[in-house]
Amino acid sequence: MQSIYGASREHYTILRKMPYALSFLHRQLFVKLPMPTKSFQGKTVIVTGSNVGLGLEASRWIVRLGASRLILACRNVQKGRAAAKDIQTSTGCSPETLDVWELDMASYKSVQAFASRVHTDLPRLDVFIANAGINSHQFQTFEKDEAMITVNVVSLFLLGLLLYPKLRETAAKYKLQTNLTITSSDLHEIAKFEEREAPDGQIFCALNDQSKFSGIDRYATSKLMEILLVKEIAAMAPLESRNVIINCVSPGLVPPSSR
């Protein structure tokens, strides 16, 4: 039986007894994840942040597993096309399998335009992998909020909620389960999230206080917020009635990649 960390039941028992840092190292050094084998035959998949790193490698595996159509959602279309060519070369897939669509998670207008295109141009949507995110040690704002909160939290869930009806429609039409999966991080464990103590309705104002900004804590906080929001949405949209699986995954420690 696989645990949420990809480990056996015995490994999971060991992990539960360890402090966070030790359990993290244990997973990194001793837990070997199985290669994916689930077929994506006939499925349409969207992966955001798919021109590099985790998004690129996830996209490559999805194509290897037989996806009929994969949308590479990228801020930079030119880099997205280079990624598509790389995937074609390594997998031998048909060029018609891959599409590159522009998506800038720092812009609500771009997020809304992307979602509108999905509803207009895609007959179905089986899997949405929300992988795009940023990690910065410098304070900056997008859409009047701190950048990591805008990109990693608000835009992510705006897009997820806009695409949810398409996932639900596909599940009902084809009598299967669809997926909304968010790339989170083990770093949520170390989030201080002191802004949660702000008065009602003032959390975002507190997060915009540059004098109290810490890059590493803000990134960890954004990942904690992802997990908390996924739990809330999953509770409001039970799998039994809608057949849309909503979850988070943690990739562990991976090498950084430039965007």
Please identify what each model-predicted range represents.
Residues Y20, L25-S258:
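Rossmann-fold NAD(P)H-dependent dehydrogenase/reductase core
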